[in-house]
Amino acid sequence: MTRKSRRLWLVGACLLGLGTATALVLNAFSSNIVFFMAPSQVRAHPPAADRTIRLGGMVVAGSVRRQTQGDTPIALFDVTDGQAAVTVRYAGILPDLFREGQSVVAVGTVAPDGAFRASEVLAKHDETYMPKEVAEALRRSGKWDPRYGKAPDAASWNTMTVGDARHGEANRS
């Protein structure tokens, strides 16, 4: 084997190793990325059943239902962005700051029946905080325009009922 062919084999092996390492890193990143979606996006373009997403919006007033399955507490509630609502099923204890009419981010997957199976529920920490993703979803839905002030507070969402959220209408009296 000549010196030139040995060098060519070495360069080829290095490129093959670099390509393999790049493919492995990209595969690891793609399986660990969790995308944020608003309820209207989930309704319009449901993600694959095995795809983990973050669902963010406001908890619809009057939608929280509590059950038990054995010793495990089950919470069912609707999350809305003002245009659509998605029912969330969470097995576990909800955060202390979880309230109807407050912003929430749930991490989980969409079931074949369209319900969202949450593995984690994150509640806001005070009445003025709204997660960046939820505020962005409200802006995109037309429920809030940053040129006209801060995002709507929880009190303005407390008047939205389950029926209004499912039909995309906010009952603002």
From Swiss-Prot:
Keywords: Cell inner membrane, Cell membrane, Cytochrome c-type biogenesis, Heme, Iron, Membrane, Metal-binding, Signal-anchor, Transmembrane, Transmembrane helix. GO terms for cellular component: plasma membrane. Heme binds at residues 125, 129. The keyword Heme applies. GO terms for biological process: cytochrome complex assembly. Signal peptide: none annotated. It is found in: Cell inner membrane. Residues 29-173 are periplasmic. Residues 1-7 are cytoplasmic. It comes from the Bacteria. Residues 164-173 have a biased composition (Basic and acidic residues). It is a single-pass type II membrane protein. Residues 148-173 are annotated as: Disordered. The chain crosses the membrane at residues 8-28. Heme chaperone required for the biogenesis of c-type cytochromes. Transiently binds heme delivered by CcmC and transfers the heme to apo-cytochromes in a process facilitated by CcmF and CcmH. Also required for indole-3-acetic acid (IAA) biosynthesis. Belongs to the CcmE/CycJ family. This is Cytochrome c-type biogenesis protein CcmE. It comes from Gluconacetobacter diazotrophicus (strain ATCC 49037 / DSM 5601 / CCUG 37298 / CIP 103539 / LMG 7603 / PAl5).
